[in-house]
């Protein structure tokens, strides 16, 4: 081992001292201190940013991984269950289509049925008729009972029996004419004497032909030629000739039990329908029945009488009930010859087909009636005043006999045909 070199030791000592001095300046120099601090902060910030970027990258990577997993799951589902989804969709489509087809079918059936009902109409085929009963001349009254009863329509009237009617001069008959009238000579406080006749014979179906020269007319009057079944209204009622006060148009009306309607159906007729429910107790009907008014020709009242009257016809069969009126100058030759053929006539005034009314159920065997009442349920009250008639109906009828000289029936004949 040799002796240490003193020069080398001095250099070593100097370098150590210089280093120590530099370190001291770095530590205690404020400027260098701030610079160093900033460098530290910058380095720390850069580290945080790098860490944040790394976090975002990791998050994006995680999201991508999740999306890829979801996509892979859906793809797997599509690959694993395509038949199930298609099967389910086709079943759903089939069910919806089936429901729609059923609904369309039901709706079409309902509408089709309504249309079929609305358009359906009886053929009213031609019949060969034979005369079964004729009321005329001096034997006319022998076929009727005189109904000495209280008026069921609450009229201001006294219905007399046959003997009383004859004594008071209310009835008469010869080979050409049959007269039935109300008293037109005296005042009455309990009702004006009049007539109500009902046939002794029942009829079921047939052609009823009334040749009428004159019908009762004037304020307060309510005449009617009609048919009536037992157990009213279930047996039915057919008003062939009817009007009140100073009216000018005849009305043909059916009165029935529940279940006979003429609404929304095909009807072939020239008259005007007034009501469509024939049930006497239909809401707000007040026993109006289902009436048809004859708007043309002098079918009622003063004009009818001045025109020499005319012929009223009722055709009653299972398919329906129809009615005609012919002016005196327009009576078909087959009627006057005694061989009526309704199939050859013009359209009826009234048509009541069996579309919504079982004719044979609603109308039992019928009797024929003629009557003449006053005021009552129809001709009186507001109807009387609205016709322009004076005072109250009962007072006028009871105290003005001279106003009832036109209140009479003049009948040429009534014939009943059946097939």
Swiss-Prot record:
Catalytic site positions: 237 (nucleophile), 242 (proton donor)
Ranges of biased composition (kind: Basic and acidic residues): 30-59
Topology of the protein relative to the lipid bilayer: Single-pass membrane protein
Compartment(s): Membrane
Domain GH16: 122-387
GO biological process: fungal-type cell wall polysaccharide metabolic process; glucan catabolic process
Region listing for Disordered, in residue ranges: 1-20, 29-67
SUPFAM superfamilies according to UniProt: Concanavalin A-like lectins/glucanases
Gene Ontology CC annotation, any one: fungal-type cell wall
UniProt GO MF annotations: hydrolase activity, hydrolyzing O-glycosyl compounds
UniProt keywords, alphabetically: Glycosidase, Hydrolase, Membrane, Transmembrane, Transmembrane helix
TM regions (residue ranges): 88-108
EC number: 3.2.1.-
Paired cysteines (S-S): none
Main location: membrane
Family per similarity comment: Belongs to the glycosyl hydrolase 16 family.
Name of the protein in question: Probable glycosidase C21B10.07
Source species taxonomy: Eukaryota, Fungi, Dikarya, Ascomycota, Taphrinomycotina
């Amino acid at each position: 081992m040799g002796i240490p070199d003193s020069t080398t030791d001095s250099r070593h000592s100097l370098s150590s001292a210089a280093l120590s001095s530099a370190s001291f300046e770095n530590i205690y120099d404020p400027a260098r201190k701030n610079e160093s601090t900033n460098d530290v902060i910058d380095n720390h910030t850069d580290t945080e940013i790098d860490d944040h970027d790394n976090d975002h990258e990791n998050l994006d990577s995680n999201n991508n991984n999740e999306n890829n997993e979801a996509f892979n799951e859906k793809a797997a589902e599509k690959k694993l269950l395509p038949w199930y989804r298609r099967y389910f969709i086709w079943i759903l489509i089939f069910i919806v289509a089936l429901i729609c087809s059923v609904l369309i079918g039901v709706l079409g059936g309902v509408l089709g049925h309504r249309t079929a009902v609305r358009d359906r109409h009886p053929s009213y085929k031609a019949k060969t008729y034979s005369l079964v009963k004729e009321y005329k001349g001096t034997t006319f009254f022998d076929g009727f009972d005189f109904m000495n009863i209280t008026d069921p329509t609450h009229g201001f009237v006294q219905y007399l029996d046959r003997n009383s009617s004859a004594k008071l001069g209310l009835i008469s008959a010869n080979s050409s004419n049959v007269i039935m009238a109300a008293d037109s000579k005296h005042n009455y406080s309990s009702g004006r004497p009049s007539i109500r006749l009902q046939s002794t014979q029942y009829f079921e179906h047939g052609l009823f032909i009334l040749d009428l020269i004159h019908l009762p007319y004037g304020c307060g009057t309510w005449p009617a030629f009609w048919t009536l079944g037992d157990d009213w209204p279930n047996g039915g009622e057919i008003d062939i000739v009817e009007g009140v006060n100073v009216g000018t148009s005849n009305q043909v009306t059916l009165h029935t039990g529940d279940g006979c309607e003429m609404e929304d159906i095909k009807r072939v007729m020239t008259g005007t329908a007034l009501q469509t429910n024939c049930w006497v107790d239909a809401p707000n009907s007040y026993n109006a029945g289902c009436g048809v008014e004859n708007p043309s020709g002098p079918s009622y009242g003063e004009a009818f009488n001045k025109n020499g009257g005319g012929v009223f016809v009722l055709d009653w069969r299972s398919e329906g009930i129809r009615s005609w009126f012919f002016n005196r100058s327009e009576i078909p030759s087959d009627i006057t010859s005694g061989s009526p053929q309704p199939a050859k006539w013009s359209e009826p005034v009234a048509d009541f087909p069996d579309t919504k009314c079982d004719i044979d159920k609603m109308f039992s065997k019928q009797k024929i009636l003629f009557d003449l009442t006053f005021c009552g349920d129809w001709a009186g009250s507001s109807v009387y005043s609205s016709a322009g008639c004076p005072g109250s109906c009962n007072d006028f009828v009871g105290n003005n006999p001279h106003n009832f000289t036109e209140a009479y029936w003049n009948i040429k004949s009534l014939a009943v045909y059946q097939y």
